[in-house]
């Protein structure tokens, strides 16, 4: 089971199990929620090619409940889709209680929310999320479980990558249009970017590669950013020509992705499995946050600065313990002053808040009982709730096999036996 957490001004979006919560980062109060219906109403799909499927999105129900919002508005249920969306009356593939939230992404204009699901019903759900209630626009089936989501800069379409390396484009205007297969990798894609001018799609995978693909002519690869020696777990767009990447090879790097040129390589204390970047000064100063794999410090905060001659440097480093070792950390997000971290404690979901300046647990502005309220909202405290065991990230690392040593040992024994026979 996955837990997703992200910050989209002015709210934290938290997905777990069958629910998505919208939380006010200031007082940690829930002011809106979405619950997946038992049946997503997928009619099934026909094959468009061996890699692609047409998505005939049909009936689905969206339950969106608004809590006590910051403005004090009452809760409301949003069970009906918007005009032009899908109806809630048709039947689909049947009840699939194991279906759960996989990935969540907000559109740049803040109007749309994309949710992918895993389990028996793999789907891309598109919601109209603002101004108040979340209303379902479409539910389109996915051939495989998703690995990453990314909206384009004008929110007109969304990219979905899956765990076999394929990348599909879904239209957010014609919400029932079938997907378009854009590109493919030979291994799982962990993150994806779409440049602001929509001229390039940037993907990273388990095979150490960062690929820059031209759009819309995605058969044409513009460049590669090569140098990582392990999986590339995260990407972040810095400027029109620069990206940051984090990898299991214990490095944080900055690239000119147009030229495929590495501009900075910074050593990390442990493999990196998540990367987030905040802009502090436009196109000049950034804060990169890295989640480590099995290290005494859970996160590293790095200040990236760009000089006038286009050189990059790390000018400040802060390591955040976040009580690593006492619980299994799975994900995190940042605001201007706090770090929000999700994980498992005794196989139960937990959420902790830390001060971004000190790295210590946040003390001010955290109401009593907030954690129980959030966990109740996600259904994590319900009777019969399944245990929460974060993804085993050890499978991300390459498996290296040494059959040369065995061969040399056998050869050595054979030579010794031949020499003994000659002497005998």
UniProtKB/Swiss-Prot annotation:
Annotated organism of origin: Drosophila melanogaster
Function: Required for the Mettl1-dependent formation of N(7)-methylguanine at position 46 (m7G46) in tRNA. In the Mettl1-wuho methyltransferase complex, it is required to stabilize and induce conformational changes of the catalytic subunit. Required for binding of nanos mRNA and repression of translation by the mei-P26-bgcn-bam-sxl complex. May cooperate with mei-P26 and nanos to derepress the BMP signaling pathway. May cooperate with mei-P26 to suppress expression of a subset of microRNAs. May cooperate with mei-P26 to regulate bam expression levels in germline cells during gametogenesis.
Name listed for the protein in its UniProt record: tRNA (guanine-N(7)-)-methyltransferase non-catalytic subunit wuho
Gene Ontology biological process terms from the UniProt entry: oogenesis; spermatogenesis; tRNA (guanine-N7)-methylation; tRNA modification
Record flagged with keyword Chaperone: no
Tissue: In testis, it is present at high level in hub cells, a niche for germline stem cells of testis. Ubiquitously expressed in all testicular cells throughout spermatogenesis. Ubiquitously expressed in all germline and somatic cells of the ovary.
Subunit structure comment from the entry: Forms a heterodimer with the catalytic subunit Mettl1. Interacts with mei-P26 and weakly interacts with bgcn; required for the function or formation of the mei-P26-bgcn-bam-sxl complex. Interacts with nanos; may be involved in mei-P26-dependent derepression of the BMP signaling pathway. Interacts with Myc; the interaction may be mediated by mei-P26 and may be involved in the regulation of ribosome biogenesis.
Gene3D superfamilies to which the protein is assigned, alphabetical: YVTN repeat-like/Quinoprotein amine dehydrogenase
Keywords from the UniProt entry: Cytoplasm, Developmental protein, Differentiation, Nucleus, Oogenesis, Repeat, Spermatogenesis, tRNA processing, WD repeat
Primary location class: nucleus
Pathway of action: tRNA modification; N(7)-methylguanine-tRNA biosynthesis
Chain intervals for the UniProt region annotation (Disordered): 42-92
Biased composition (Low complexity): 46-68
Subcellular location: Nucleus; Cytoplasm
Coiled-coil stretches noted in the UniProt entry, renumbered to this chain: none
Placement of WD repeats on the sequence: 96-137, 184-223, 227-265, 324-364
Note: Wuho means 'no progeny' in Chinese.
GO cellular component: cytosol; female germ cell nucleus; male germ cell nucleus; nucleus; tRNA (m7G46) methyltransferase complex; tRNA methyltransferase complex
Keyword Nucleus found: yes
Disruption phenotype: Male sterile and female semi-sterile phenotypes. In males, spermatogenesis is arrested at the elongating stage of the developing spermatids, resulting in an absence of mature sperms in the seminal vesicles. The decreased fertility in females is mostly due to defects in oogenesis. There are abnormal egg chambers, in which cystocytes fail to arrest cell division at the fourth mitotic cycle, resulting in overprolliferation. Cystocytes fail to differentiate and do not make the transition from mitosis to meiosis.
UniProt similarity note: Belongs to the WD repeat TRM82 family.
Source organism, top-level taxon: Eukaryota
């Amino acid at each position: 089971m996955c837990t997703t957490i992200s910050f989209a001004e002015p709210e934290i979006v938290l997905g777990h199990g069958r629910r998505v919560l919208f939380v006010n980062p200031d007082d940690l109060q829930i002011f809106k929620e979405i619950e997946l219906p038992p049946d997503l109403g997928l009619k099934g799909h026909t094959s468009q090619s061996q890699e692609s499927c047409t998505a005939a999105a049909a009936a689905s129900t969206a339950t969106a409940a608004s809590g006590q919002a910051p403005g004090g508005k009452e809760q409301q249920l949003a069970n009906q889709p918007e005009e032009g969306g899908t109806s809630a009356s048709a039947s689909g593939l049947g009840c699939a209680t194991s279906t759960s939230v996989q990935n969540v992404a907000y559109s740049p204009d803040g109007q749309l929310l994309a949710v992918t699901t895993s389990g028996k019903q793999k789907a891309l759900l598109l919601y109209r999320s603002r101004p108040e209630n979340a209303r379902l626009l479409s539910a389109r089936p996915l051939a495989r479980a998703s690995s990453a989501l990314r909206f384009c800069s004008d929110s007109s379409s969304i990219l979905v990558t899956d765990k076999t390396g394929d990348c599909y484009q879904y239209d957010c205007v014609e919400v029932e249009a079938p997907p378009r297969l854009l590109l493919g990798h030979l291994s799982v894609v962990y993150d994806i970017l779409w440049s602001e001018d929509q001229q390039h799609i940037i993907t990273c995978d388990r095979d150490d590669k960062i690929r820059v693909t031209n759009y819309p002519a995605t058969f044409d690869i513009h460049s590669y950013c090569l140098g990582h020696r392990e999986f590339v777990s995260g990407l972040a767009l810095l400027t029109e020509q620069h990206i940051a990447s984090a990898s299991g090879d214990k490095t944080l790097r900055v690239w000119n992705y147009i030229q495929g040129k590495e501009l900075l390589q910074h050593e990390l204390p442990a493999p990196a499995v998540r990367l987030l970047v905040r802009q502090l000064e436009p196109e000049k100063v950034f804060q990169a946050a890295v989640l480590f794999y099995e290290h005494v410090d859970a996160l590293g905060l790095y200040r990236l600065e760009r000089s006038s001659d286009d050189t990059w440097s790390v000018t400040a480093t802060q390591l955040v313990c976040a009580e690593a070792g006492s619980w299994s950390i799975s994900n995190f997000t940042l605001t201007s002053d706090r770090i929000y971290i999700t994980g498992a404690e005794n196989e139960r979901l937990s959420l902790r808040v830390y001060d971004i300046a000190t790295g210590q647990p946040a003390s001010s502005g955290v109401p009593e009982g907030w954690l129980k309220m959030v966990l109740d909202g996600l259904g994590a405290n319900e009777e019969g709730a399944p245990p929460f065991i974060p993804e085993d990230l050890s499978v991300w690392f390459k498996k290296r096999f040494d059959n040369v040593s065995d061969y040399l040992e056998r050869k050595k024994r054979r030579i010794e036996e031949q020499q003994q026979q000659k002497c005998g």
